[in-house]
Amino acid sequence: MTTQYQPNYAKLRELLPRVGTVRMVQCSFSQYSSRYDAFCAGQTPPVFDPLCAGGALMDLGVYNVSYIVGLFGEPNKAVYAANMERNIDTSGVLMMDYSGFKAVSLAAKDCAAPARCIIQGTKGYILQKSTPNYCGGVTFHPNEGKEE
């Protein structure tokens, strides 16, 4: 995983204290797979093969998990709820419980949405308008004032 070595990941670490007490973390990485239609037609491309570490959590969600665990450490508890097709998760939500806050990871290969990560705190939030592995476009939004 290269997420933690991206220049903006270091910026995230610097900005983190400014949000105050962290209350919620959201990471979303949803990308309609070019192989999903073949999967629906009965084929088993590697990205949808559990023997090849396929599926939404292992292929895309791992970047969300690396991003969150890299910033906050191992959660106290984690629960994964997946949309399953033919014994593989095509999309899913991983909820991680930390002392005092929750982190949610959304990963999907069967639908698409803008990628983003948000760290919400008592004094504002950090918004990253990119996939967690890219760490692009990091801004801080204080509760009162302009984005930085």
Model-derived regions: residue spans:
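N-terminal Rossmann-like NAD(P) cofactor-binding subdomain of oxidoreductases
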Residues: 1-3
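Short glycine-rich, flexible loops that bind phosphorylated cofactors or substrates
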Residues: 5-6, 34, 112, 135
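Predominantly a Rossmann-like dinucleotide-binding segment in NAD(P)-dependent oxidoreductases
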Residues: 6-76
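Alpha-helix boundary/capping detector
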Residues: 38-42, 82-83, 94-96, 145
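Contiguous beta-strand/loop segments that form the cofactor/metal-binding neighborhood of enzyme cores
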Residues: 64-137
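C-terminal helical cap and adjacent loop that interface with cofactors, partners, or active-site loops
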Residues: 134, 144-148
